A protein has these predicted regions:
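Residue-level marker for buried hydrophobic side chains located in beta-strands
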Residues: 25-27, 55, 78, 150, ...
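Active-site HxH/HxHxD metal-binding segment of metal-dependent hydrolases
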Residues: 32-37, 41-121
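Residue-level marker for the onset of beta-strands and adjacent loop->beta junctions
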Residues: 3, 13, 109, 115-117, ...
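Metallo-beta-lactamase
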Residues: 31-32, 94, 124-199
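Conserved N-terminal entry element of GNAT/NAT acetyltransferase domains
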Residues: 1-3, 122-125
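Conserved beta-strand hairpin/beta-sheet module of binuclear metal-dependent hydrolase folds
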Residues: 1-47, 140-152
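Short Gly/Pro-enriched turn/cap motifs at secondary-structure boundaries
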Residues: 5-7, 108-111, 130-132
Length: 199
């Protein structure tokens, strides 16, 4: 199951992935205010969930501005691609440029994920898939059993993420579309997908 909680002034989605076992993962915790933080905590507590992972699709401030809060609250590292750490270190500059609160990146412990690496919690298994182009270190999280992938800003409804920001690469975005997402059929814009082989 997936709960979508829109957050911050960019209206970015925080995702809570969970099942009947009560274990869950948070993806792109992007809360800016105590009220937004409370929305996440209220949902987790209402379902009596145990957070096992805090995942990041890519290290742009609008997707990671709540990471410090989440890592502290649940005593977990931030799981992300090692290739995105350099951009993560620019979070204070990004925050100032984009109107976000500053976060203390040094307080966040990183758990590096590799493309094709699988993580499991409860009865859910996710595969990290490379989503290069929009931002260095972009990962998608693919749930083959339920037929979706959370893509961050790599893919939108009839569009792709910007490539004019630091580290963006339009050619890489096209490679991601052709090589990675060609395996999937888009069925929802916010969490796109279903494996073509399952049709």
């Amino acid at each position: 199951m997936v709960e979508i909680i829109p957050q911050n002034h960019f209206e970015v989605n925080t995702y809570v992935l969970y099942d009947e076992t009560g274990e869950c993962a948070l993806v792109d915790v992007c809360s800016q205010t105590s009220r937004e933080e409370r929305a996440i905590l209220d949902f987790v507590n209402s379902k009596d969930l145990k957070v096992k992972y805090i995942l990041l699709t890519h290290p742009h401030i609008d997707h990671l501005c709540g990471a410090e809060f989440a890592c502290r609250e649940f005593n977990l590292p931030l799981s992300m691609s090692q290739d995105g750490v350099e951009i993560l270190r620019t979070a204070s500059w990004q925050a100032e440029a984009m109107g976000f609160k500053r976060i203390n990146v040094e307080a966040i412990k990183i758990n590096s994920l590799l493309p094709e690496e699988e993580i499991s919690f409860g009865d859910i298994s996710l595969k990290a898939i490379e989503c290069s182009g929009h931002c260095p270190g972009s990962l998608g999280y693919y749930n083959a059993k339920e037929g979706y992938v959370i893509t961050g800003d790599a893919l939108f409804n009839q569009s792709i993420g910007r490539t004019d920001l630091q580290g963006g690469d339009l050619d890489c975005s096209f490679i991601t579309l052709n090589k990675t997402f060609s395996h999937y059929l888009i069925i929802q814009w916010y969490i796109p997908v279903m494996d073509r082989k399952q049709r």
